[in-house]
Amino acid sequence: MSMKALHLIFICLFFSIVTEAATVETVKVFSKSMNKEIPVVIVAPEKSEKPLRTVYLLHGYGGNANMWLGIKPNLPDIAERDGLLFVCPDGHNSWYWDSPKDPSSRYETFVSQELIEYIDTHYPTLPAKEGRAITGLSMGGHGALWIAFRHTETFGAAGSSSGGVDIRPFPKNWEMDKQLGSLEENRELWDSHTVINQIDKIKNGDLALIVDCGYGDFFFEVNNNFHAKLLENAINHDYIVRPGVHNGPYWKNSIDYQILFFLKYFQMN
């Protein structure tokens, strides 16, 4: 075979690989409720023979829309391999609440309504709860469960990795007082805005749930308590504990298991 022919084959293979790569783009999604544009990183497979299943990934405190790609650089490969659409919104340091203290911070409304509408309008998704999952790390773990528990008509599966699933033991941390006021003066708000107290709002079968946390994580105890309350309420869920602390290497590993869990849910629905 001539060198010219080999060169041609190489070029064809190269372009076939490129055309099958997932696309990564950052879009600005306008939030009517907050009257501003929100950056959102979207990882979409190049080809899909069926409507895309969507996984919403929420970042932690101090992060932004690029955080998940920084932790998991091969997210585009996973999107292409599994035919998944990953949506990573910028949640600022909001804890993904509609803040009762700051009317300009309405990230629950943004993620659960405005962003969903944008994604289902602009991408070939399955526009039903059976086609959507949501998860996140740390602050985003709390946010994902908070939103899913309160919008079971929108999401079919939800997860949390190292999530701050009970905020009350940490009243001085992560600017939560900007959203809720101080714990001392706003005990009822803190009680009603911690996701462990939202468990009573769901029933078994409303959501496919997966929760994980590392043994060395400062959120380990509250995750154990969260798991215990789910058991007490007879809510089926996967609960995974493994060696690890509150950092990127832990989440780089844990997200693989969550994606596998969501894939199984999508395949069954």
Region locations from a protein language model:
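Non-catalytic cap/lid and distal C-terminal segments of serine-dependent acyl enzymes
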Residues: 21-269
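Bacterial N-terminal signal peptides
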Residues: 7-16
